[in-house]
Curated annotation (Swiss-Prot):
GO CC terms of this entry: mitochondrial inner membrane; respiratory chain complex IV
Name assigned to this protein: Cytochrome c oxidase subunit 7A1, mitochondrial
Function: Component of the mitochondrial respiratory complex IV (CIV, also named cytochrome c oxidase complex), the last enzyme in the mitochondrial electron transport chain which drives oxidative phosphorylation. The CIV complex is the component of the respiratory chain that catalyzes the reduction of oxygen to water. Acts as an assembly factor that specifically drives the homodimerization of CIV complexes, mediating the formation of mitochondrial respiratory supercomplexes (respirasomes) containing two CIV: supercomplxes with two molecules of CIV show improved activity.
Organism placement in taxonomy: Eukaryota, Metazoa, Chordata, Craniata, Vertebrata
Transit peptide (first-last residue): 1-21
Organism: Saimiri sciureus
Keyword GTP-binding: no
Main localization, broad class: mitochondrion
Length: 80
């Protein structure tokens, strides 16, 4: 019975202290993302969003090209 009490006390103390130290930045982010400035919403986060978008698109294109290559390779049987 002691173990659940100790773990519950640790969880409660960690969650309450962490919650008090964080600043609520939701209104700032809402203002940023709701601004009508012509930038797509998936790029409004800054440089990190630009890099993440480019990497994601590169991986998607690379995966698609590799899938087409594998299908083409599998569709032509080897000569024995």
């Amino acid at each position: 019975m002691l173990a659940p009490r100790v773990s519950q006390a640790l969880i409660r103390s960690f969650s309450s202290t962490a919650r008090n130290r964080l600043k609520n930045r939701v209104p700032e982010k809402q203002k940023l993302f709701q601004e009508d400035n012509g930038i797509p919403v998936y790029l409004k986060g800054g440089v990190v969003d630009h890099i993440l978008y480019r990497v994601t698109m590169g991986l998607c294109l690379g995966g698609t090209a590799y899938g087409v290559y594998c299908l083409a390779w599998a569709s032509f049987p080897r000569n024995k």
